[in-house]
């Protein structure tokens, strides 16, 4: 199979690691080779969490600059920060609901303008799918399901060798039963949002 490289970036607490775990489980269920690595940074203090997932036969978990087939950003500024991993053929999916860093909140930093941020990403990549995933997570009944909204958008692109059914089966294994219904609804809302983007 053709190798596919995925980068997921988020701020600590947004559920990046659960999303990666669901994708890993889905790959395992359908016997797709997968190498995965994570960088936690200062995750517990709102720092960056980055996951690299490489689907296909490869020996490395490193995705070098310009190698990502797809970038999923749970937070807009983090998406912009990871843009160096992209190339002219990369598809970028980003949440447009910002989580303001401490420095911005105390007036010692400036958050990027969302319109300019999208223009920069659009210029460097093949396709940008950008929407407010936090709004869709609330609509699904769980404000913490932004990760599942973005997972739905990712699977809709058809870039990864995973189907909706495979990912939903993995969600049933990896997510808490109390949140399963809202997570499945969040996934479907993200899928629909990417479809109409």
Model-derived segments and their meaning:
Residues 1-197:
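Active-site cofactor/cluster-binding pocket
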């Amino acid at each position: 199979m053709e190798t596919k490289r995925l980068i997921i970036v988020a701020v600590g607490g947004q559920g990046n690691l659960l999303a990666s775990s669901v994708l890993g489980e889905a790959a395992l269920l359908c016997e797709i080779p997968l190498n995965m690595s994570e960088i936690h940074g200062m995750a517990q203090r709102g720092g960056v969490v980055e996951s690299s997932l490489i689907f296909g036969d490869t020996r490395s978990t490193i995705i070098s600059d310009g190698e990502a087939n797809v970038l999923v950003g749970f937070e807009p500024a983090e998406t912009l920060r990871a843009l160096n991993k992209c190339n002219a053929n990369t598809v970028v999916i980003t949440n447009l609901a910002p989580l303001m860093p401490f420095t911005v909140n105390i007036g010692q930093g400036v958050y990027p303008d969302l319109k300019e941020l999208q223009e920069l990403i659009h210029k460097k990549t093949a396709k940008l799918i950008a929407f407010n995933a936090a709004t869709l997570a609330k609509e699904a009944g769980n404000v913490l399901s932004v990760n599942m909204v973005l997972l739905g958008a990712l699977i809709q692109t058809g870039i990864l060798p995973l189907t909706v059914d495979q990912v939903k089966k993995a969600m049933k294994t990896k997510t808490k039963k109390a949140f399963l219904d809202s997570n499945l609804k969040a996934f479907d809302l993200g899928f629909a949002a990417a479809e109409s983007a």
